């Protein structure tokens, strides 16, 4: 059975470690990264953040706590409301232009990792600019960030990708399947 990631109790925490243990044991010592990642069957589902999104608390937590995989280094303060700012991004009234926000949910052959990413951009005129491009360490090494970088550039253009994430475009993320649910 897939294991969901969230606010853990002791059993859930143990289940998380069991997923990682199974994944570690499944890796062959001589197996290259690309081959192992393909065998993992990684799926990243990208969904628009809705004004009534049930994952709002997780999205705020992710933006506040992520360090290494926070490519914009933008952290909202504790009063930031994802439902007002990100959830209703397309119709947010206090700023001109179009805004868009997605959450990223990841699963692979070993389990479900839950919401592991927030990708957001805003547009005034023709150019998009990055607002958030942040991922949890739960997906570190899975190349989900590289797959999302390529997807974002294809969808909105290079101006939507943070400068710190441009190097991801050179990473082979072909082992990650992107599913868009918006």
List each model region and its residues:
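C-terminal cap/substrate-recognition subdomain and adjoining C-terminal extension
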Residues: 1-102, 110-115
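Acyl-donor binding region in acyl/amide transferases
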Residues: 108-109, 115-182
């Amino acid at each position: 059975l897939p294991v969901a990631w969230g606010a853990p109790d002791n059993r859930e925490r143990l289940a998380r470690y069991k997923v990682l243990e199974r994944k570690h044991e499944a890796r062959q010592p001589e197996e290259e990264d690309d081959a192992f990642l393909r065998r993992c069957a990684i799926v990243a589902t990208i969904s628009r953040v809705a004004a009534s999104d049930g994952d709002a608390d997780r999205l705020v937590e992710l933006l506040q706590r992520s360090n290494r995989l926070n490519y914009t280094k933008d952290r909202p303060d504790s009063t930031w409301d994802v439902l007002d700012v990100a959830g209703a991004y397309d119709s947010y009234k206090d700023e001109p232009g179009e805004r868009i926000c997605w959450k990223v949910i990841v699963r692979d052959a070993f389990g479900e990792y839950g919401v592991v990413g927030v990708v957001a951009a805003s547009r005034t005129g023709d150019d998009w600019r990055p607002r958030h491009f942040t991922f949890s360490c739960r997906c570190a090494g899975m190349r989900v960030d590289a797959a999302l970088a390529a997807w974002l550039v294809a969808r909105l253009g290079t101006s939507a990708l943070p400068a710190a994430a441009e190097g991801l475009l050179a990473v082979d993320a072909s082992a990650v399947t992107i599913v868009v649910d918006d």
